[in-house]
A protein has these predicted regions:
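Glycine-centered coil/turn sites that cap beta-strands in beta-rich domains
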Residues: 1-18, 22-42, 64-67
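Generic structural signal for well-ordered beta-strand positions
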Residues: 50-51
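Short, surface-exposed loop/turn motifs with a glycine/proline- and acidic-biased composition
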Residues: 54-84
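Extracellular and select intracellular beta-sandwich modules with Ser/Thr-enriched
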Residues: 86-90
């Protein structure tokens, strides 16, 4: 059984934001199997980085970040989690 747990948590996970669609704020959760340098950023669809939510070393475990999009236009945005050895992106939808 311990082997299964190790396999499940061998790499970071990036959850879907909630609520989604959202207005004006949403929550993003991610989990780290080991401490790591973390950068969690939000991008527009042209690839421009519009917000950096986390840019520091984080410890093992679950983490949660709120994103306030109060100054942004309605539309689809991407958020990306980058660690020492992992990168994943997901879409989020801002509706005004």
């Amino acid at each position: 059984m311990a082997r299964d747990k190790e396999t499940i948590h061998s790499k970071p996970t990036l959850g879907q934001n909630y609520p989604n669609p959202f207005n004006p704020s949403t929550t993003i959760k991610y989990e780290l199997p080991r401490s790591s340098e973390v950068r969690l950023s939000v991008y527009d669809l042209l690839g421009r980085e519009i917000a950096v939510l986390v840019n520091e070393r984080r410890e093992v475990g679950g983490h949660e970040v709120k994103f306030d999009a109060s100054g942004l236009a309605s539309g689809v945005y991407l958020y990306r989690l980058k660690t020492d050895d992992f990168v994943q992106s997901r879409k989020l939808l801002l509706l005004r």
